[in-house]
């Protein structure tokens, strides 16, 4: 998993749970043809975690990078009655069939992303999110199609608030 190592230190320091589901296919089902078994697996995994831990509905984020960022953005905005926050890193697309609730969204993208060019995605995502009333933090950064540690730190602060001192 390319994403988890960037979030684990924050989870340990700030005291939150991480659920890291994997797609059933080479990438998330929505990328290759709509919601299917990945969404069902995510629902089941979230229900299993909720059966063992008390979850704060005001602090439940869907997060991901690249195709996972697109999936988090699409599923999180569609299910804003479940997710209070969305952290989308280098998301290429946002596919929202319907929207429930209005999760807060942290959207980050590298200015020189060679795989998913920023100009083809982030501005359009930001416009759609703002037009539909979402609280949006847009975080461009200097870099390619990568996860940047300080950006993840900002995303966690947007999710949980700044750390207490």
Language-model features: locations:
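Short amphipathic alpha-helix adjacent to the substrate-entry channel of hydrolases
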Residues: 1-19
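Loop/turn elements at helix/coil->beta-strand transitions in domains of secreted/extracellular proteins
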Residues: 13-18, 56-60, 81-85, 101-105, ...
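Gly/Ser-rich "nucleophile elbow"/oxyanion-hole loop immediately N-terminal to the catalytic nucleophile
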Residues: 29-66
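Solvent-exposed, acidic/flexible segments
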Residues: 31-39, 65, 76, 98, ...
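Primarily recognizes the serine-hydrolase "nucleophile elbow" in alpha/beta-hydrolase
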Residues: 50-52, 58-102
């Amino acid at each position: 998993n390319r994403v988890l190592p960037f979030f684990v230190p924050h989870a340990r320091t700030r005291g939150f749970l991480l659920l890291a589901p994997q797609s059933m296919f080479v990438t998330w089902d929505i990328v290759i043809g709509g919601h299917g078994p990945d969404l069902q697996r995510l629902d089941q995994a979230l229900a299993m975690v909720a059966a063992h831990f008390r979850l704060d509905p005001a602090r439940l984020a869907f997060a991901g990078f690249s195709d996972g960022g697109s999936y988090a953005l699409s599923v999180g905005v569609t299910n804003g009655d479940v997710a209070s926050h969305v952290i989308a890193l280098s998301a290429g697309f946002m596919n929202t069939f319907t929207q429930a609730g209005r999760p807060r969204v942290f959207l980050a993208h590298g200015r020189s992303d060679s795989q998913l060019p920023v100009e083809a995605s982030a501005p359009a995502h930001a416009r759609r999110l703002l037009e539909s009333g979402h609280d949006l933090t847009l975080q461009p950064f200097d870099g390619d199609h990568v996860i940047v540690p300080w950006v993840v730190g900002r995303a966690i602060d947007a999710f949980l608030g700044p750390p207490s001192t």
